[in-house]
């Protein structure tokens, strides 16, 4: 069977069976059908908000999913595609659909998509290029398991969690973790990680390694206390206005609320990011030390890497 045709009066199809036809190349729908429409041989809902079926033997190498698509039905619609090489997903999906066991070589995931779902690209053994734009928040378990041709991937800022075995049995040897990730679940020990220092290494009873964000609070004369970074509910400046002399330095200090309770002491800056509005007036280091370069004013923004919470300090250089 190479073609499947939906007549005008048909309002329901056995989609699970339809998506199991290995030889299917094209789907056609009568123009006056009330439930479905087809475009380039692909089956959608009448309003084109749902993708129902992409023929497994469709000869096209490139598929740009229409931006109108908000949902891909879980009837193996994009699984085990034989000829598709380049896939661009709709920006209006909430998560990536299942595309496992397909011939895909390149996939583009728009930043509006919240996450890469569990096993989405499992066993896509020709997949060698993954483009992810900023906005992705999570990658679930085994998302790229057995993608042996995948040798590198750039993870975007804003990513918060990486699940179990996401990059197991891929070609990835090194991986840079952005400074927004809160947790990396069990990861292949053979992968060399370049990660933020606030991600601490832990071992499960099984011996599996995982990483989790920790926030350290230091108070004068007391032992430093460490909390899960996910418990931070607010950060604020010790002082919101600073005046320094040209050529002099001072260090910004951050107060922190854990589970809505203000703690004594100051937050270790390793989990913070510092930026200045005027680099010619004020220089700021990764540890929060500011230096007055010339007379003027600047605003230093302090951001909690894991959630994006911020506060601002107004700096005047005399």
Each predicted region: which residue ranges?
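Consensus positions within tandem repeat domains that build extended binding/scaffold surfaces
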Residues: 75-76, 117-120, 141-143, 163-166
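Structural signature of tandem-repeat unit edges
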Residues: 1-41, 46-71, 79-94, 102-115, ...
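Hydrophobic structural packing positions in well-ordered secondary structure
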Residues: 43, 121, 211-212, 274
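Small side chains
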Residues: 107, 114-115, 165, 237, ...
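Non-catalytic beta-sheet/beta-sandwich ligand-binding modules that flank or precede catalytic cores
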Residues: 208
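Extracytoplasmic soluble-region selector
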Residues: 156, 228-318
């Amino acid at each position: 069977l190479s073609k499947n045709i939906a007549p005008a009066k048909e309002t329901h199809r056995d989609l699970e069976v339809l998506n199991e036809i290995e030889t299917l190349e094209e789907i056609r729908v009568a123009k006056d059908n009330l439930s479905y429409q087809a475009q380039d041989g692909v089956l959608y809902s009448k309003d084109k908000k749902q993708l129902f079926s992409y023929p497994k033997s469709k000869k096209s190498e490139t598929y740009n999913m229409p931006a109108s698509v908000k949902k891909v039905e879980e009837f193996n619609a994009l699984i085990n595609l034989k000829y598709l090489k380049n896939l661009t997903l709709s920006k209006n999906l909430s998560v990536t659909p299942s595309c496992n066991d397909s011939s895909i070589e390149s996939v583009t995931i728009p930043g509006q998509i919240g996450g890469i779902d569990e096993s989405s690209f499992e066993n896509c053994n020709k997949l060698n290029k993954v483009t992810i734009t900023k906005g992705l928040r999570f990658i679930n378990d085994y998302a790229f398991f057995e993608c042996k041709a995948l040798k590198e991937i750039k993870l975007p800022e804003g990513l918060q969690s990486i699940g179990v075995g996401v990059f197991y049995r891929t070609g990835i040897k090194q991986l840079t973790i952005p400074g927004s990730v809160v947790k990396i679940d069990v990861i292949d020990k053979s992968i060399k990680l370049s990660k933020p220092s606030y991600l601490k290494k832990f071992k499960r009873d099984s011996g599996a390694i995982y990483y989790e964000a920790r926030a350290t609070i230091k108070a004068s004369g007391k032992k430093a206390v460490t909390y899960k970074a996910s418990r931070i509910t607010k950060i604020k400046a010790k002082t919101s206005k600073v005046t320094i002399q040209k050529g002099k330095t001072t260090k910004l200090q951050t107060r922190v609320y854990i589970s809505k309770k203000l703690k004594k002491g100051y937050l270790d800056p390793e989990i913070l990011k510092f930026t200045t509005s005027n680099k010619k007036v004020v220089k700021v280091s990764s540890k929060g030390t500011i230096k007055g370069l010339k007379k003027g004013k600047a605003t230093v923004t302090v951001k909690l890497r894991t959630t994006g919470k911020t506060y601002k300090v107004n700096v005047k250089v005399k």
